[in-house]
Amino acid sequence: MASMCTFSSPFLLCNSSISRTNIVACNKQTSTLQAQVKNVATIETTNRRSANYAPSLWSYDFVQSLSSKYKGDNYMARSRALKGVVRTMILEANGIENPLSLLNLVDDLQRLGISYHFLDEISNVLEKIYLNFYKSPEKWTNMDLNLRSLGFRLLRQHGYHIPQEIFKDFIDVNGNFKGDIISMLNLYEASYHSVEEESILDDAREFTTKYLKETLENIEDQNIALFISHALVFPLHWMVPRVETSWFIEVYPKKVGMNPTVLEFAKLDFNILQAVHQEDMKKASRWWKETCWEKFGFARDRLVENFMWTVAENYLPHFQTGRGVLTKVNAMITTIDDVYDVYGTLPELELFTNIVNSWDINAIDELPDYLKICFLACYNATNELSYNTLTNKGFFVHPYLKKAWQDLCNSYIIEAKWFNDGYTPTFNEFIENAYMSIGIAPIIRHAYLLTLTSVTEEALQHIERAESMIRNACLIVRLTNDMGTSSDELERGDIPKSIQCYMHESGATEMEARAYIKQFIVETWKKLNKERQEIGSEFPQEFVDCVINLPRMGHFMYTDGDKHGKPDMFKPYVFSLFVNPI
């Protein structure tokens, strides 16, 4: 853990209340504790719970062995050449004469994961299409349902307000929508961009879901069937972009109108980025090994899974430093969550929470060794990022980062007390605390800092404008997590989750409670969509994307189980995203 102490030293030198003697003592204490990690379980006499988490499938040696030929100059040169060809393709496309073709191209570029190369070009294209076809109802007259649906989705995604009434011409007297199968698929995808009180889109989602499920049973075109079945599992708006890219590159050759040059560029870009992600993961793995936290037998060793969360948040090549920071934050949250949920006694947890709130390094002698280690890891990582931000961007962010950990631990201790008292909270009482205890808010706050080009007091205060957006993103992750993990967590002795709280309060069956939570997630997405439309332009686009991508990751990780907690479920994605090139 010597490297972790090195992280803290520069910041401590900036703090006049802590002497150099204390810094040296902190360094020595941390190094000593590192040697004691492996003995924590053997010296323990307190009777503690165990979650019996499965061990990690990914050894340090395996991660360090990852390599890729796509770091070579010849691949980079070919990528630059293909990028130029695709850019010309966008610029020469005539969106006025054939808007559907151009919208399909934009959609393909996004799903193939290469749209980040052409942000200005895509922005200009969508602006022209909006002005010529979507700005006012009189421009909709000659547009079919397919064009309206695809344009609606892409334009709403990029911040344009397109009213739901654009679809009313395609509703018959019975309330059914009229269109072919591709139109229905695009309308289905468009409906997930709804906000509150948009009944036309609610009806569209219900109708198209039923229509597509019925069509899937009898459809002869297996290529279209492939796209329908994929959409019914994960609508595009709820899909993790990098996971979607991995899937879409494989099926894009089957799509009508596919472009071989676009496909070649997408494959090459995916493999080049995979090489970048391998190096990021190797660096994170070295840090994880230095902390020795993987030797904590009571906690989940999930470094690779935590790294996946950061790739979901932002996979772009320039965000390497950010992924490094966020992987550390994710990993520490996972371990500290297990401390509060399973391993720690209530007196220990109350003391730990008090020390986090005071942020007093001199008070940690009162803690058991395993909690000293947890506190020092957060303390040092916070100091490191504070120091780097102060030296690189000229602003002291330590209070901002410290508060993120304090808010998290204060939510954890509430749940620990609920468990200790055998208390089942009401549904509303649960979610008012659980949106924080899911651990997403600290990630978002760190991500905000990492995406700011200029860090100022005004910028840090401005995030308060996004509090509702952040809360709803956290809440979706919380509820998707509950849908996928609550049964396992109850078996190991955790507190009741949202499903059980709703059942206890309302008398509902588990099936009824799950249906309620599922609809609650849909309604929360509507709020998130609206907040993104209203205030998204006030923040860096990469930050807004991160906020939206985290609930997408919640759906991905916890649909049909717990990919974060059960390594076997996540294994195929490690190989497809980080090991095997396309």
Swiss-Prot record:
SUPFAM superfamilies for the chain: Terpenoid cyclases/Protein prenyltransferases (SSF48239), Terpenoid synthases (SSF48576)
EC number: 4.2.3.120
Motif DDXXD motif, chain ranges: 337-341
Keywords: Chloroplast, Lyase, Magnesium, Metal-binding, Plastid, Transit peptide
Biological-process GO terms, alphabetical: diterpenoid biosynthetic process
Note on cofactor: Binds 3 Mg(2+) or Mn(2+) ions per subunit.
Domain notes: The Asp-Asp-Xaa-Xaa-Asp/Glu (DDXXD/E) motif is important for the catalytic activity, presumably through binding to Mg(2+).
Protein name: (-)-beta-pinene synthase, chloroplastic
Gene: QH6
